[in-house]
């Protein structure tokens, strides 16, 4: 439900904002920030990070209970790392959280992201590499922009470059997969203030929301993904 809310919000407001930008030459920075603020509102949370802190390895930024070498195709263990760092980010940036603006937590976030980039876990299920991981990274980077202390530009840029390199191309996919990949293209475009990438991403987010006889919305309002299925 959260993803659908974000999707249609981005389609409607994003396209309107972007067209206005092109037509009236309004500040691009304001337009990108407006989209990022909508994303933050959709994912806002006040997490309990007690368990994550207990498992955090201060020596290298990893988590002691995560198998980073795992390549299993479902419930991919390394994704726990990104989910916990994401919780750290939301705790650090939420005024209602006890760890709000906590310097030690900031250091854990930075070291945890450095570890992830250097370790570069890989899954045999493409979905984790091209959708789950880059989406989660995009959201946490957007949220971290609101922090008292910002991530080093070098760290943020190399994470964005990794997302670009490994995150896939939405135009090569159909249906929900196309939309899911396009979403993290939107996140990356906003963070890098790349108008061309944003336009491409918005086109691909909107594209599956049409009737088709292939994967996607059918004329009877059903939806096909991964092939056709018989009604039960």
Predicted segments with their positions:
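Alpha-helical protein-protein interaction elements
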Residues: 9-10, 35, 55, 108
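Mature N-terminal, pre-catalytic/accessory segment of carbohydrate-active enzymes
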Residues: 23-75
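Aromatic-lined, polymer-binding surfaces characteristic
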Residues: 53-232
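Short, flexible coil/linker elements and helix-boundary hinge sites characteristic
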Residues: 14, 19, 46-47, 147
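Residue-level detector of solvent-exposed, low-hydrophobicity positions
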Residues: 11-15, 39, 134
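Bacterial Sec-dependent N-terminal signal peptides
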Residues: 1-25
